[in-house]
Design a protein with these regions (language model features):
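Glycine-rich phosphate-binding active-site loops on the catalytic face of alpha/beta enzymes
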Residues: 20-43
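Flexible, glycine/charged-enriched surface loops at secondary-structure junctions
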Residues: 34, 59-70, 94, 165-170
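Long, charged amphipathic helices and adjacent flexible linkers at domain junctions
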Residues: 49-85, 193
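Nucleotide-binding motor/catalytic cores of P-loop/tubulin-like NTPases across gene-expression machines
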Residues: 105-107, 113-150
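Conserved, mostly hydrophobic/aromatic
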Residues: 1, 23, 109, 171
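C-terminal helical cap(s) of enzyme catalytic domains, especially alpha/beta-barrels
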Residues: 37-59, 185-196
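Flexible glycine/proline-rich, aromatic-decorated loop/lid segments
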Residues: 6-28, 53
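Beta-strand/loop-dominated core regions that host nucleotide or nucleotide-derived cofactor-binding catalytic loops
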Residues: 138-141, 153, 157, 182-200
Length: 200
């Protein structure tokens, strides 16, 4: 309970504010309240306070280069993720689209805290639920496709249908190619492809 004192008081303690801010500093994707809103006297104030602390902390952090590099480049997957974020900045892309079976690609991109929205496109309800808690990611349901090109085309179609992109927009697509990725069962386990596409 990060703002525990707000169960009974309209303002948190300084230590509680520091706890929330430190969670953001540490790269936490999601923070939540429990007793403060379930049984507290000031549930609305608690939500506003937590949101305010998170927004102020992120606003401060985004000025630091380390904030966007926090994902770290440890392997090919993370190198592709870092490259996708860098490319999206350089080409002034509208968003980053991640066709994914497991949600791993979207999580990988999220680690680098891009300035653009990340759209996870998955046929898996499980993956969609998981990505809801990842920083900066919004998930949408797609249909199962056989090839990488069909998967990417389908993801762009879903993005257009939801009004996420429009004709002429540049988008960065990052995914795993099942032809060249090591796989485990039906799940692609390696992110190894990034491309830029213009919406037609």
């Amino acid at each position: 309970q990060m703002l525990d004192s707000m169960i009974h008081n309209p303002r948190p303690t300084r230590a509680e504010v520091a706890d929330v801010a430190n969670a953001i500093y540490d790269g936490t994707d999601c923070i939540m309240l429990s007793g403060e809103t379930a049984a507290g006297k000031y549930p609305v104030e608690a939500v506003r306070m937590m949101a305010s602390i998170a927004e102020d902390t992120e606003r401060y952090l985004t000025k630091s280069r380390d904030y966007h590099d926090r994902g770290g480049i440890k392997n090919v997957n993370s190198a592709i993720g870092a490259a996708a974020v860098e490319i999206s900045n350089r080409v002034d892309a509208t968003c980053i689209i991640c066709p994914t079976h497991s949600g791993r690609t979207a999580r990988l991109i999220s680690n680098f805290r891009p300035k653009l929205p990340i759209y996870a496109m998955s046929p898996s309800n499980h993956a969609i639920r998981k990505t809801c808690f990842q920083w900066g990611v919004r998930a949408y349901k797609t249909t199962e496709q056989g090839s990488l090109s069909a998967t990417c085309y389908n993801a762009l179609t879903v993005a257009k249908e939801h009004g996420l992109v429009k004709t002429g927009d540049l988008v960065v697509i990052t995914a795993g190619d099942p032809q060249t990725s090591p796989s485990q069962g039906d799940y692609i386990t390696s992110t190894n492809m990034t491309m830029v596409s213009q919406i037609q």
